[in-house]
Amino acid sequence: MKVLLVNKFHYLKGGSEKYYFELAELLKEHGHEVAFFSMEDQKNIITGDKEYFVEKIDLNTGSKLKALDVIYSKTNYKKMKEALEDFKPDIVHVNNFQRQLSASIIKAIKEKNIPIVFTAHDVQAICPAITMMDNDKKICEKCMHGKYLNCVKKKCNKGSTLKSLIGALEGYYYRINKIYTKKIDFIITPSEFYKVKLIEDGVSGEKIEALHNFVELSKYD
């Protein structure tokens, strides 16, 4: 089977990237062919597999206009279509794609009728600030069920009105276009907590499975 793996960072930035690369190795060990779709960066790891890159978006230093691409990037839509035409995957496994890659890549994949599996490494599907904590560092679920203006009122995204507004607009776009409830075919969560919260927020429990991140036990012998 040919699997296209998607993640916005193609270097070891955090846990989701570790998962992304180790999943690729595990798939290859089981005889599958993999390719990667991510952002350009000098720190990117060369894997020896097919790799497709889009222009890097730095949300901390980029222009305000460029930041609007986090909602829908026409460029990344075209790049994904090109990658799909070239690699012809049987399935696309999406990891962290929100903001830098944008929901436009999901549209490109769905237009090809290719199944999409999404691993939700965080709770961004529910909380525009990703943390489920407000700007006062208090546990918060006020943005659930599409009430994203709460994020703007509290400046939950790094204390910034602009970043919180962009996060809220992104959340509204995803909800209106049913990215998580309809467009993505199956969702993997690393914990039961994430699964429960997604179900509470409207995602069907039939399309979610809690699957803890795997560990290579030989490294701990």
Residue ranges and their predicted role:
Residues 193, 214:
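Carbohydrate-associated surface elements
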Residues 51-56, 110-111, 134-138, 205:
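Short, hinge-like loop/turn segments at secondary-structure boundaries
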Residues 17-18, 45-50, 105, 128-133, ...:
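Short aromatic-enriched loop/helix-cap "lid" or pocket-rim segments at secondary-structure transitions
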